[in-house]
């Protein structure tokens, strides 16, 4: 039982750490991308620039 408990906590902490790291990377990339690309293609995005493609890419990260 002790062994099971330990393995469980270990996997949980690992998942949590990975999740946090992922979100951090995502936020950083989003900010960098937005600041650089927003000014250039603002009109294009508003019109509906490849919404499907963007959502797909966003879901992946």
UniProtKB/Swiss-Prot annotation:
Any one Gene Ontology cellular component term annotated for this protein: nucleosome
Superkingdom in the source lineage: Eukaryota
Sample GO molecular function, one term: DNA binding
Subcellular location, record wording: Nucleus; Chromosome
PROSITE patterns: PROTAMINE_P1 (PS00048)
Keywords from the named record: Chromosome, Developmental protein, Differentiation, DNA condensation, DNA-binding, Nucleosome core, Nucleus, Spermatogenesis
Family membership: Belongs to the protamine P1 family.
Region: Disordered, residue numbers: 1-61
Any one Gene Ontology BP term: sperm DNA condensation
Broad class of the protein's primary localization: nucleus
Organism of provenance: Aepyprymnus rufescens (Rufous rat-kangaroo)
Disulphide connectivity of cysteines: none
Role noted for this protein: Protamines substitute for histones in the chromatin of sperm during the haploid phase of spermatogenesis. They compact sperm DNA into a highly condensed, stable and inactive complex.
Record bears the keyword Nucleus: yes
Full protein name: Sperm protamine P1
Tissue expr: Testis.
